[in-house]
């Protein structure tokens, strides 16, 4: 098969979205209510990693970057994730806190996109979550200088074993370079696939202490 033939096959990959629509009359006033419902349904459907979300940031040149992290908490203040503070995403957030989140629940023919500003979590919040993690995950946080170049995986594995020995007694201390961010919710868009590509999209936009809801064309 030629590269062109393979490209033509990709171009024709498509399917109809038939799992149901989203109507204005069914929308709650608070988008968190709908988000919680959809997340619960994603969990009930046993999707792989239902809390996985794409975090998009931009560097000082305006170049976008994306990566998948796990949502660890959400409430009216925002959506929370944890990371190495020396990572590329953390540095980019420090210089430009505007980020976008995307929950790609493909199996349910749904997406949720959140845009807002990211801010660092308090040390108290970080410590509480860090010590709730499995012990090996706590040690793993010490191992990697995230986004730095390394010559082989063996370097990480050797470092892990070294630190596991070092921290075998007592609590694993919180690394100074490990923390988290809370992304405020300025806009939340809910997307539900529809037949004939007539998808349903609703945008919640914060206006003072309330939410304005608009239907968007697909």
Curated annotation (Swiss-Prot):
GO terms for biological process: pyridoxine biosynthetic process. InterPro entries: Pyridox_Oxase, Pyridox_Oxase_CS, Pyridox_Oxase_N, Pyridoxamine_oxidase_dimer_C, Split_barrel_FMN-bd. Gene3D superfamilies: Electron Transport, Fmn-binding Protein, Chain A. It comes from the Bacteria. Its EC number is 1.4.3.5. HAMAP family: PdxH (MF_01629). This is Pyridoxine/pyridoxamine 5'-phosphate oxidase. It comes from Escherichia fergusonii (strain ATCC 35469 / DSM 13698 / CCUG 18766 / IAM 14443 / JCM 21226 / LMG 7866 / NBRC 102419 / NCTC 12128 / CDC 0568-73). The lineage of its organism: Bacteria, Pseudomonadati, Pseudomonadota, Gammaproteobacteria, Enterobacterales. The gene is pdxH.
């Amino acid at each position: 098969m030629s590269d062109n033939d393979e490209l033509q096959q990709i171009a024709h990959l498509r399917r109809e979205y038939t799992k149901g629509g989203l109507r204005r009359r069914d929308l709650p006033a608070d988008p968190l209510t709908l988000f919680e419902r959809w997340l619960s349904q994603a969990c009930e459907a046993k999707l792989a990693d239902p809390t996985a979300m794409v975090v998009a940031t931009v560097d000082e040149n305006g170049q976008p970057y994306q990566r998948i992290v796990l949502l660890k908490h959400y409430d009216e203040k925002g959506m929370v994730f944890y990371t190495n503070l020396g990572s590329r995403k953390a540095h980019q957030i420090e210089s430009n806190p505007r980020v976008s989140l995307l929950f790609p629940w493909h199996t349910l023919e749904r997406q949720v996109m959140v845009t807002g500003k990211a801010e660092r979590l308090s040390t108290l919040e970080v410590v509480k979550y860090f010590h709730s993690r499995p012990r090996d995950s706590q040690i793993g946080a010490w191992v990697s200088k995230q986004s730095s170049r390394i010559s082989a995986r063996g370097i990480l594995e050797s470092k892990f074993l070294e630190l596991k020995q070092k921290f075998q007694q007592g609590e694993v201390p919180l690394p100074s370079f490990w923390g988290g961010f809370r992304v405020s919710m300025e806009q939340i868009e809910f997307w539900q696939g529809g037949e004939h590509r007539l998808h349903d999209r609703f945008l919640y936009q914060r206006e003072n202490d309330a939410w304005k809801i608009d239907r968007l064309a697909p």
